[in-house]
UniProtKB/Swiss-Prot annotation:
Domain of life of the organism encoding this protein: Bacteria
Domain called S1-like: residue spans: 1-72
Gene Ontology cellular-component annotations: cytosol
Main localization category: cytoplasm
Record key words, sorted: Cytoplasm, Initiation factor, Protein biosynthesis, RNA-binding, rRNA-binding
Name this protein carries in UniProt: Translation initiation factor IF-1
Length: 86
């Protein structure tokens, strides 16, 4: 799929299903089914309910997506990568 045909959005994993499929609630309130990308499978990146993730959605089907990045949490519990230093 060309990179021009995807929409990147952030969300939170709400439910883990079988076969590396997750129910993700996006920041705009929509719920979608998302699978782990091949690169995340290859590197054994584990995902759990409550994790913040970046999801790529196809412009042709906005109900399914691919999880491409898991956001790390710092010790304070806020998102890392916000640009603020403590």
């Amino acid at each position: 799929m060309p990179k021009d045909d995807v929409i990147k959005m952030e969300g939170t994993i709400t439910e883990a299903r079988r076969n590396a499929t997750f129910l993700v609630e996006l920041d705009n309130g929509h719920k979608i089914l998302a699978q782990i990308s091949g690169r995340m499978r290859k590197n054994f990146i584990r995902l759990f309910p409550g994790d913040r993730v970046v999801v790529e959605l196809s412009i042709y089907d906005l109900t399914k997506g691919r999880i491409v990045y898991r956001k790390k949490l710092d010790r304070k519990g806020s998102d890392e990568g916000t640009g603020e230093r403590s």
